[in-house]
Amino acid sequence: MSSNNEILFARAQKSTPGGVNSPVRAFRSVGGTPRFITRAEGPYFWDADDRRYIDYIGSWGPAIVGHAHPDVVKAVQDAATRGLSFGAPTEGEIRMAELICQLVPSIEQVRLVSSGTEAAMSALRLARGATGRDTIIKFEGCYHGHADSLLVKAGSGLLTFGNPTSAGVPEDFAKHTLVLDYNNPQQLEDTFKEIGNQIACVIVEPVAGNMNLLPATPEFLQTMRRVCTQYGAVLIFDEVMSGFRVALGGAQSMYDIKPDLTVLGKVIGGGLPVAAFGGRTDLMQHLAPLGGVYQAGTLSGNPVTVAAGLATLKLIQVPGFYESLATQTGKLVAGLSAAARAANIAFSANSVGGMFGMYFAAEKPQSYTEMMKCDVAHFNTFFHAMLDAGVYLAPSAFEAGFVSAQHDDAIIEASIQAARQAFAQLGQ
């Protein structure tokens, strides 16, 4: 007899490509049937078969205060009674912008949009418009949404201009995108010496979370800041994932580096669709209606989303919030590592704030190339053992995990105990 999840997946595939609205949800890389979620609360969610799971994806980052937090739910309910969307400015948008500028010192002005892809795409357009240059630099393994210019992966040559890695991306778009190695400061410096006056911007995840978890080295980001300043290129930190996730001021506050523009998302919407890009006033003044760089959106600054975001940002400003979050994430990572050692499994793990990564490799990867050498088959087996034990991890070996403020000691210990059993099975 088919489970409710299997029935829903079969039904979904008839009306939705692949049965999902974002590819990783399909379980294609790990195999099996995706879980269709019916409700969530705190650190848990429940699937269509009423099975409860400890959740470590947290909607891919936004659920930092836990699912269905009463303060966030009330803010959404109150806002909804006043209207869902106006197509006109509101005071809530001002409050959100003021708060972001207050919490992220590099941001002097900010504009709200509806998705991380839209924010990254707009930041690139702004950088090109402000500099009058076309070439952008991104790094292999970093994900900045699905805009055409950013779906590019380079070959191995130092100055190899990328071929599109998604069907439907014209080479004329891809040719302006140069892809370099993450955590390779010398390659970056050499590239700027070669074509620095042609480069409009460099965009980077300071804590990469879409090739599993891979933090940038301080030297890498310091070199980036220096050469961008030297050659007049715009430095863009994509903190859609790390912003308000690893620290109150984002990863840039941890590294003490000021980008020219920052892209935000996820946490600032409290679980509803929103993103933002902001930075230096002289750059932001190039945006319409003041300047010639056009950007607009029907639902930008949506009042219900803004209400959820403001409620979430209030909760994460409580003293000790990030210290506690990092402590719990560290306990999880230490417990997973100890369980793997006990089972003699080649495994390593890392954490930054409320993000963590698991690698089926003896040492923590330091580059995209090293990350690709991790044992995916072992991860897939581990994933399903944990899923069967009621622990929901990212259904991909190359996605970061997320801990919320609701993951207390009992939740962490239950997760580690499940991992002990999963590693033991893997070692047989």
Swiss-Prot record:
Keywords: Cytoplasm, Isomerase, Porphyrin biosynthesis, Pyridoxal phosphate
Gene3D superfamilies found in the cross-reference section: Aspartate Aminotransferase, domain 1, Type I PLP-dependent aspartate aminotransferase-like (Major domain)
Catalytic activity: (S)-4-amino-5-oxopentanoate = 5-aminolevulinate
Predominant location category: cytoplasm
Any GO molecular function: transaminase activity
Associated pathway: Porphyrin-containing compound metabolism; protoporphyrin-IX biosynthesis; 5-aminolevulinate from L-glutamyl-tRNA(Glu): step 2/2
EC number assigned by the record: 5.4.3.8
EC main group: isomerase
GO cellular component: cytoplasm
InterPro entries: 4pyrrol_synth_GluAld_NH2Trfase, Aminotrans_3, Aminotrans_3_PPA_site, PyrdxlP-dep_Trfase, PyrdxlP-dep_Trfase_major, PyrdxlP-dep_Trfase_small
Pfam families on file: Aminotran_3
GO biological process: protoporphyrinogen IX biosynthetic process
Subcellular location: Cytoplasm
PANTHER family per the UniProt record, alphabetical: GLUTAMATE-1-SEMIALDEHYDE 2,1-AMINOMUTASE, GLUTAMATE-1-SEMIALDEHYDE 2,1-AMINOMUTASE 1, CHLOROPLASTIC-RELATED
Subunit structure: Homodimer.
Family the UniProt entry places it in: Belongs to the class-III pyridoxal-phosphate-dependent aminotransferase family. HemL subfamily.
Protein name: Glutamate-1-semialdehyde 2,1-aminomutase
